[in-house]
Design a protein with these regions (language model features):
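A short beta-loop-alpha structural element at the N-terminal edge
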Residues: 32-50, 60, 224-225
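Active-site rim helix/loop that mediates acceptor-substrate recognition in acyltransferases
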Residues: 51-107, 231, 246-251
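Conserved acyl-donor/pantetheine-binding loop and adjacent beta-alpha core of acyl/acetyltransferases
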Residues: 95-135
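Conserved acyl-CoA
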Residues: 122-127, 150-166
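Conserved GNAT acetyl-CoA-binding A-motif
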Residues: 130-131, 159-172, 200
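Conserved acetyl-CoA-binding loop-helix of GNAT-fold acetyltransferases
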Residues: 135-138, 143-159
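Conserved beta-strand-loop-alpha-helix junction that forms the acyl-donor binding cleft
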Residues: 155, 168-179, 197, 224-226
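Conserved active-site alpha-helix within GNAT-family acetyltransferase domains
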Residues: 160-163, 173-192
Length: 282
């Protein structure tokens, strides 16, 4: 992780400054600052160039990780007041970016969190505003500096300033590199789906702003490889959610929660020692 961030405001907008630890995988002898701040239509051309550069550096099979957009797309996107783009700069160079979209109803959220079976707006006793996070994009030469995690953390702070009640995001199920920063920021893997835009398999992630945990009193923990999709889907149907990710072993740890189901599901009383002595049969 990088050195401590310096956080300040310019024209009522958050600006975070930190130090890079490496560029192109090589440690830096002298400090090099980066800045995270909001983007504007003036950055649209840089955003299009960054999107193209990142997409062109994807390996085979990673095409579903992000969507490539032109600078014309980014000029148009700033017409929507509910979308807030942020960027990571090294000097005047844009090296990373993402966005937050404030959703006020289920229809708006479905555009960002497709095929989610959980309705965040149904039967709520308070006004619900969901901050849906877009993909985190960083130039390959600047990876390894935890910039993804800091962009997530920045947007969580922005969501709080915008009075959002929840944060959500999607991650391609094969993109284990983006799982680490979301789980580090206490997001829950609560469902899986198919992205209608490209047919990719996605994990749906959520963090309630007002709760530290949504776990039930059932203490069972089950660990599975991130790519055992059928087993993971079966666990989710039984009321389990992903709560931790082991980057080294690429394993997801699941725990039980009643938060994402309309009623409590009855769990089988048979035990299985394939995963641990207290694991429910899957």
């Amino acid at each position: 992780m990088n050195n401590a961030l310096t956080k300040y405001e310019v024209n009522n907008q958050m600006v975070w400054r930190g130090n890079l630890s490496k560029i192109d995988g090589s440690p830096l002898e002298k400090p090099v600052h980066f800045y995270i701040r909001p983007l504007s239509v003036e950055n649209a051309s840089q955003m299009g160039e960054l999107s193209e550069a990142i997409y062109n550096n994807l390996k085979e099979g990673e095409e579903c990780f992000i969507h490539k957009h032109s600078k014309e797309y980014y000029y148009d996107v700033f017409q929507n007041d509910n979308i807030h783009y942020i960027g990571v700069f090294v000097g005047s160079k844009l090296v990373g970016m993402s966005y937050l979209k404030v959703c006020h109803n289920e229809e708006e959220l479905q555009e960002e969190l497709p095929n989610s079976s959980y309705n965040f707006f149904k039967n709520s006793k308070r006004e619900v505003k969901v901050a849906s996070f877009g993909a985190d994009s960083v130039l390959p030469s600047y990876r390894g500096n935890s910039l993804n995690a800091m962009m997530i953390n920045y947007r969580m702070s922005l969501a709080s300033r915008l009075d959002c009640t929840d944060c959500t995001s999607i991650v391609d199920r094969n993109n284990r590199w983006n799982m680490t920063p979301y789980f580090a920021n206490r997001f829950n893997l609560f469902s899986t789906a198919i992205d209608p835009s490209d047919g990719g398999k996605i994990s749906l992630l959520h963090k309630p702003m007002s709760k530290d945990t949504v776990l039930s009193n059932i203490k069972t923990r089950i660990t599975l490889p991130y790519n055992r999709f059928e087993l993971i889907d079966d666990l989710i149907k039984k009321g389990f959610i992903g709560v931790e990710f082991d980057k080294k072993d690429a394993n997801v740890t699941f725990a039980h929660s009643n938060f994402y189901v309309s009623n409590i599901r009855r769990l089988p009383r048979v035990f299985d020692t394939r995963f641990n002595k207290n694991a429910f049969v899957i």
